[in-house]
C-alpha cells in the first residue's frame, strides 16, 4: 500500500451567528460536500499564509489568520491501494472587509438563495474558486447541520459527525506525485514543564540537522497518528516522561532548502511544527528511551534561567521566549 502525507490549513469565519462554508466542485477534494474554506499548503508556505490565500481564492474575501484553534488528523483509504493521511490546522479568521465576495461576483449570486441540497441562505455565491469550489455561503449552524459536511467541518462546528460515503475523497487530483528532493514533515512539539516550572529539553544527536542544540521534545507524527498522541509518544521516547497536553500554543514553519541529514544528500525540507503546552505532573529523571541511533542524544530538566543560556533550536528559543512574556 502507498502512503501519502498532506497538510491543510482551514479557517473559521463568523458573521454574527453565521459561519462561512464552501462546497467542493468537481476538481475539489470532496466533490459536492460542504466544508470550511481552506486547503493544502504549498511547499515552504506558512499555514497562516496558506489559509489566507485559500480563502481569497475560494471566496474572494480578504482575511487575516488569528488564533490556531485546533489541529486534527484523518486518514482515508482508497481502492487504488493508497492511504492518505492529512493533518488539518484550523485558524480563527478576521475579515478585512464587509463584503461576502468581490463586487465582480455580483452577477454570480444565486437568484433565490437555494442551496439545492439543504436550507435556504442569503448571500450565496456560485462558480467560485476556479473549479475546486462551486458554492460559497454564510450559514447558521442549524442550516449547516442540514447539509453534507466533511467530518472535520462538523467537528469544528460542534455538529454531529457523519462518515462520508466511500469514494467521496479524491486524492488522485488533490495530491500530485512527491518531488524526489523535497520533503514535507509534520511534527508536534511540546513546551514541557513540571509543577516547579522546570522545562524539559532534548539535545539533538550528531548526524541530524541542528546537532548539539537543545530542542523541544517531540517530532514527526506517524501515519494515522493524531498530533497530541504523537507528542506524548515522543515525550516517553525522548525524555522518559508521562505528560498531559493542556494547551495548543501555535504553529511554527520551517523551510530549509538544503538540509543535510541521515539521507546523505541535501534535501529541500519543509517542516510544519505545531507546539503544545504539556505538563508532567510527576517528573522523573530525564532519560532517552528510544533506540540507539535516534535523533536525541540526551534530555534534561532546566530552570527557565538555565534554559535561555543553552544553545537552543529555533523552535525551542521561540517557545521559551514566548513563555516568559
Spell out what each predicted region is:
Residues 103-113, 117-161, 286-322:
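NUDIX/MutT-family hydrolases
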Residues 3, 33, 81-87, 130-133, ...:
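A generic structural micro-feature
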Residues 62-71, 242-251:
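A short coil-to-beta-strand element that immediately follows conserved catalytic motifs
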Residues 17, 73-107, 121-124, 254-287:
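Active-site-adjacent beta-strand/loop module that shapes the phosphate/pyrophosphate-binding cleft
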Residues 1-12, 158-191, 204, 266:
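Acidic, metal-coordinating catalytic segment for phosphate/diphosphate chemistry
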Residues 18-58, 198-241:
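Conserved Nudix-box catalytic region and its N-terminal flanking loop in Nudix hydrolases
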Residues 11, 68, 89-93, 188-190, ...:
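A structural signal for short, well-ordered beta-strand segments
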